[in-house]
Curated annotation (Swiss-Prot):
It comes from the Bacteria. Transmembrane segments: none annotated. This is Large ribosomal subunit protein uL3. Coiled coil: none annotated. Belongs to the universal ribosomal protein uL3 family. The keyword Ribonucleoprotein applies. Disulfide bonds: none annotated. Part of the 50S ribosomal subunit. Forms a cluster with proteins L14 and L19. Residues 133-152 are annotated as: Disordered. One of the primary rRNA binding proteins, it binds directly near the 3'-end of the 23S rRNA, where it nucleates assembly of the 50S subunit. The keyword Amino-acid biosynthesis does not apply. GO terms for cellular component: cytosolic large ribosomal subunit. Gene3D superfamilies: 3.30.160.810, Translation factors. It comes from Shigella sonnei (strain Ss046).
Length: 209
């Protein structure tokens, strides 16, 4: 089953009939418009390309304008692709709404995490700090040794060190679908999802459901 592209609207909470508070993320899922259908004969695999939202005319490049015009859809804020399962069929120009998730219980949500800038090992990797006193005057938050000796004579790839933290693609799996509001194009999922308010999210049925 394909997924949908939405926008993170923020977090709130809703109450069950028993008065239990459930923290939810509100995802605004405007209609996804199919801009291209890929098939085995021409592309080597089956997939659909979709867009959503709107883009100012002066922000649309000529190649984008031609692509959207060929599909007969309004220019959106980006292009995303979803692989098609056996038996799934879509047509160019078709509109897909949040009702796609009406019967789905759990979803996987992918987004770009908030960027934290250049961070040290304590913040980035949860390293322990060294002694605050007892003769330690310079090495409170340093990582310590990062290698061995002349052999191997290098720092191994993947070594946890200071650097850019956040601003990377993150997927949170198996979030409960609390409510699907087709009238307002809203999807409410339990818990937090990656990214800042207003950022784009890819929502798919959970692979581990």
């Amino acid at each position: 089953m394909i997924g949908l592209v939405g926008k993170k609207a923020g977090m709130t909470r809703i109450f069950t009939e028993d008065g239990v508070s459930i923290p939810v993320t509100v995802i605004e899922v405007e209609a996804n418009r199919v801009t291209q259908v890929k098939d085995l004969a021409n592309d080597g695999y089956r997939a659909i390309q979709v867009t959503t939202g709107a883009k100012k005319a002066n922000r649309v490049t000529k190649p984008e304008a031609g692509h959207f015009a060929k599909a007969g859809v309004e220019a959106g804020r980006g292009l995303w692709e979803f692989r098609l399962a056996e038996g799934e069929e879509f047509t160019v120009g078709q509109s897909i709404s949040v009702e796609l998730f009406a019967e789905v219980k759990k979803v996987d949500v992918t987004g770009t995490s908030k960027g934290k800038g250049f961070a040290g090992t304590v913040k980035r990797w949860n390293f322990r700090t060294q002694d605050a006193t007892h003769g330690n005057s310079l090495s409170h938050r340093v990582p310590g040794s990062i290698g061995q000796n002349q052999t191997p004579g290098k720092v191994f790839k993947g070594k946890k060190m200071a650097g850019q933290m956040g601003n990377e693609r993150v997927t949170v799996q198996s979030l409960d679908v609390v409510r699907v509001d087709a009238e307002r194009n809203l999807l409410l999922v339990k818990g937090a999802v990656p990214g800042a308010t207003g950022s784009d999210l890819i929502v798919k049925p959970a692979v581990k459901a």
